[in-house]
C-alpha cells in the first residue's frame, strides 16, 4: 500500500466497504515501508507485528489507519531512541498521551521515524541511525528535526505522522518535502511522554500530505491531560469545520523581515504568488514589522540549550539506555555520556551549561528571557489588527546532504523564520506553495495565528491547498 494518492477519508471508505481489511492494510504498509525505506531511511523502527485494534468502529476516522510516530515520542513496548546512541536499546514500559489517544481512536501505530538526535538539528543528519533522504531529490536533506516523519509522508509510506516542533522542526521539513505540517499552540497537545528538548518550546504536532488529514489527527490528540500541567483545558473544536471556506475579508499580515533579500529568489516568488492569490480572493493584505526577528536565533539557542542541558542530565548510564564499560561510578557517568551523545547534542549541553553558570546567567539567559518577552509582544500587537501572519518557512529550499552539517551558524540560521512562533507559543503551519523556479524543490508557505486559533491556520492552509493542488505532484526522487 502506497499512500501518495490516499487520504484518511479514502482509507476509511475502503475499510468500511471491506475493499481492504485493517490487517491487510497494516501488512501492505509494512511491506511498502521496507521497500521504500531502502532509498529514504525514514524509519528507525518498524513494528512488524503491528496489528489493528479489535472490534474496529469505522465511525472513528482513524480506525485501522496506520500512523507513524517520531522517535522522541514514547511508545509502550516499541523501541524509542530519540535517534541517539544513548537510547539505542530503550524500550519504554509506558505510553505517551498522544499515542494513547491515537490507540483509543483505534489507529494502528506502524513504527518510529528518524530524526535529528534529541530533536537537535535542521537536517536529520545528526541521527545515530543514519541520514534520511529527501524523496524529491535523494541527494538533499529532508530538513529536521522531524525529517523522518516528513519523508515518510512525502514518499507515501504513511498517510500521516506525528512530529515535534521546538524551533521549526515540523514546519521546516514539511516545507522541504512538499507536505503540510502544523505546530499547534503551546499547551494544545499534551507533552506527556515526549522526550524533552526544551520544555517551554517543545510541542507535538502532525504532518500529512493533505490539510484535512492533519485536522483529523489533531482532533484526536489535542486536549486536556492531567499528567501535563502546561496543557490547556480549553475545549477542542472540530478542526475540519474550518475547511472549505473562502478568505474574503481575512486580515493577512506579511512581515517585511520575512520577505528580505536573505530569502532565496525562488522561495520569495513562490510565497509572493500565494499572497497574491489570497489578495485576489478578497483577503486584506497588510505589511507589518516584527522588529525583534534579528534577535530570535541567538535568543532561541540560549534558552533552548539551557533547558536542554537540564533535561539531558537524566541520561547517566545507570537507569536505562547505553552504559559504557567503566572502572568506577564517575567513569560510568563520564564515558556513558561522552560516548552516548553525538557532537551536536554535546555542543548544546555545553552552551546551555555555560549560559546558566553563575558568571553568565544574567548576561545571557536572563537577557534572552527578556528578549523573548519582546518577541511575544510583537506578535500580540500584530494580532490586534490581523487574523494571520504569513511568509516563507525557510529562506531556502532543501540543501545538499553534508553541505551545512559542519557549519553550525549557517545551520542554526535555517530556523530564523520559524523560531518566533515557538517563542510566542502560537500555532503555525507550513503548506506547499509550489516548486522553486531556481532549485526545483518544494517551498513552504508559513501561516501563524494567535494562541488557540488553529482554525484560521487550517482555513488559510486548506484554501491554498485547494487552489494550487500541489498534492497532485509526485516526488521526483521516487521515480525508478
Curated annotation (Swiss-Prot):
The active site is at residues 70, 145, 169. GO terms for molecular function: ATP binding; glutaminyl-tRNA synthase (glutamine-hydrolyzing) activity. It comes from the Bacteria. The keyword Hydrolase does not apply. InterPro entries: Amidase, Amidase_CS, Amidase_dom, AS_sf, GatA. Keywords: ATP-binding, Ligase, Nucleotide-binding, Protein biosynthesis. One of its GO terms (biological process) is translation. Belongs to the amidase family. GatA subfamily. Allows the formation of correctly charged Gln-tRNA(Gln) through the transamidation of misacylated Glu-tRNA(Gln) in organisms which lack glutaminyl-tRNA synthetase. The reaction takes place in the presence of glutamine and ATP through an activated gamma-phospho-Glu-tRNA(Gln). This is Glutamyl-tRNA(Gln) amidotransferase subunit A. It comes from Lactobacillus delbrueckii subsp. bulgaricus (strain ATCC BAA-365 / Lb-18). The gene is gatA.
